[in-house]
Amino acid sequence: MFSQKAGPIGIFDSGYGGLTVFDKIRQAMPEYDYIYLGDNARTPYGPRSFEVVYRFTRQAVMKLFSEGCQLVILACNTASAKALRTIQQRDLPDWDPARRVLGVIRPTVEMMDQVSTTKHIGILGTAGTISSHSYSLEIEKMFPHITVTGESCPMWVPLVENNEFDSPGADYFVQKHLDHILSVDPRIDTLVLGCTHYPLLIGKIRQYLPQGVTVFAQGEYVAESLKDYLNRHPEMDRRLTRGGECRFLTTESAAKFSEAASVFLNDPIEVEQISID
């Protein structure tokens, strides 16, 4: 169905947030080729149903596969929660059993026991990620002694997508959700940013955190997990091209994406506008 030639690593997100993961992966593995796809025209994914998120994510993965990607990272917690397993189990065997689609939730959960002293952890995420209970279920399987509290932060993604992460609205919504989750479980000592957009708010988040509570972002752990995965799967590593090239695709305005991406990457980039529906 797709070309068997070696190709780049694909990284997908519903918008800009996955760039925080892409940046950490590229820093850790600069020699590989990458294609980043942001479905900005249909963001946010958080409030959407399982069926819609699966359909959108499936379209994006197919697009990245058609561009030659052999491995795709869903750098979107909502897509990882609502679509990853179905794509892995239902679609990949028909498309190409040798290709892989990986998410960001499991690599994050694997670090949980190391980052918390009290073993009380808070997950800050979209409505879709929190309602799916993906984090709490994974943590319960790996670390049943850890207590997990989830907090849906529906306005945080729009704040980032609209470049308003240092606005009065950001102050209001960040403080509101931090106060609430820490009142539900005052023993929380670690907050996990369970959405790849949220690292852009990390400075604002730290302003409103009490002493003794730390913030845990995903990017570097996903990057380390990917390096480990490729070391353990040399057959996949051989299918990846190395030239240090990066392409950026968006389903919305290329100019708008390029301008916003400079906030995430601190670099001007060329962007292609595409359609995937």
What are these regions (language model features)?
Residues M1-D277:
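Non-catalytic structural scaffold of enzyme domains
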